[in-house]
Amino acid sequence: MVEFRKTIPILRIFDVAKAKEFYAGFLGFAVDWEHHFEDNTPAYLQVSRAGLTLHLSEHHGDACPGSTVFVWMTGIEEFQREISGRGYQYLRPGIEATFYDARCVQVIDPFGNRIRFNEDLKAAPAT
């Protein structure tokens, strides 16, 4: 029997410090690990939060900048309040209604990658 367990998107980055500021400092992800083949070589790292895992790579062939990741989640209002309260100077995302009956918080990282965090209105408890 075929079973797909988990998808981990790989996003292209160009600066580890900026990536950590955005993913850990702004979005609240944990940096699980960081790998370099040698000193002064490109980084490959894993960040995660609440069941979502992302790989971030400075390696040229791993991914294209400007990718989009679509994420289903719950607690979108709390998430939006939390990240907006951090005062990240480059982004202040709101919650948008979508045509597919969801609420979406879209963020764009310093490298042009988009993450669309979505909460299904049909599955979300009434507020």
Briefly describe each language-model feature range.
Residues E38-A43, A63-P65, T98-R103:
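Short acidic/glycine-enriched loop/turn segments that link adjacent beta-strands
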Residues V47-A50, V107-P110, D120:
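Active-site beta-strand termini and strand-to-loop segments that position acidic
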Residues F14-A17, V69-R114:
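Vicinal oxygen chelate
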Residues H55-S57, Q106, R116:
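Conserved beta-strand in the GNAT
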Residues A50-L54, G61-A63, G75-E78:
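Short, charged/polar surface micro-motifs in flexible loops or helix N-caps
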Residues I10-T53:
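Core segments of cupin and vicinal oxygen chelate
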Residues M1-K20, D32, S67-V69, E119-T127:
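N-terminal beta-strand motif that seeds the catalytic metal site of vicinal oxygen chelate
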Residues G61-D62, T98-F99, D120-A124:
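A short acidic/small-residue loop/turn micro-motif
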